[in-house]
Design a protein with these regions (language model features):
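Residues lining hydrophobic/aromatic ligand-binding pockets adjacent to catalytic sites
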Residues: 1-276
Length: 276
């Protein structure tokens, strides 16, 4: 059996609600943490992050350079592909040069680059024309980078899709969320053969505060904890969202416990910060 490495983080890092209040218990960031310092503090506790901002356009090189100055060796950024590629152009030929440009820019992250996520909208339905678009799009993806594709329409979870992605070495993103039923998602596990896997733990977007767990979803997480070891991949990237329970770092900790990994302790960096 392949020894697995679980690389667990959150979806984005810039949340003011994660800053510990002056008179409150540790939340995630030390008291007084500014937005400009959040990534550096984040990287002291977690080893990866999914970047949402890249979905709105390819960042300038200076943005990536700034990130690299704030993270230690071994930290990984996973990047969402610009929506112009996935939502506006729906992977057609107009998206090809934009994808090439994005990949070239992503390479600036070097060993800190994790997975590039191609997140397709629910409107990208499992039709024959869209299947042809997907088949023509996959070969333009460079072999030196790792990719995952997220479908938000259950019709894509069929053998044809699994075979196309496995042959291309591209992971099928596995998502806890309102788009694809969990049982459909879990049935796909046995068909995935790539050496990396990509998991997103998401929820309904009705919560507005993100400083603690507001709804306990331990039962759902336990099901993921049982199924994740069944993946064939040697590396499994997992990203939690605030909207799942109310506080993404707490959800990440729960998954770490389920998978037998050391949990993070926000109080530790709070104590260290108070010494200086």
């Amino acid at each position: 059996m392949i020894e697995k490495r679980y690389i667990i983080g959150c979806q984005s890092w810039g949340y003011d609600d994660w800053v510990t209040k002056a008179d409150g218990p540790p939340v995630f960031y030390p008291r007084g943490t500014k937005q400009a310092d959040m990534l550096e503090q984040y990287a002291r506790l977690l080893e990866t992050v999914e970047v949402d901002s890249t979905a709105y356009g390819t960042p300038p090189a200076s943005t990536f350079e700034g990130w690299l100055e704030k993270v230690p060796p071994g930290f990984h950024f996973s990047l969402k592909v610009p929506r112009l590629i996935t939502h506006e152009y729906s992977l057609d030929h107009r998206a090809y040069p934009l994808m090439t440009e994005f990949c070239d820019r992503a390479r600036l992250l070097g060993e800190h680059l994790g997975i590039i996520l191609i997140q397709l909208p629910a409107a990208f339905e499992s039709t024959k024309p869209n299947g042809q678009r997907l088949r023509e799009f996959l070969p333009i993806l460079p072999n030196d980078l790792r990719f995952a594709i997220e479908f938000r329409e259950p019709g894509w979870f069929v053998h044809w899709t699994f075979e196309e992605l496995n042959e291309a070495g591209i992971a099928l993103a596995m998502v806890e969320g309102p788009w694809v039923p969990r049982d459909v998602m879990f049935r796909a596990f046995g068909h995935l053969k790539t050496d990396h896997a990509y998991v997103r733990v998401m929820g309904e977007r009705d919560l507005v505060k993100f400083d603690r767990v507001y709804r306990n979803r331990d039962d759902e997480l336990a099901k993921w904890g049982e199924c994740l070891p069944k993946l064939a991949a040697g590396e499994v990237f997992i990203y939690t969202d605030n909207h799942f329970e109310g506080h993404a770092p707490a959800t990440a900790n729960k998954l770490k416990r389920l998978l037998g990994l050391p949990v993070i302790d926000p109080g530790a960096i709070e104590t260290q910060a108070s010494l200086f």
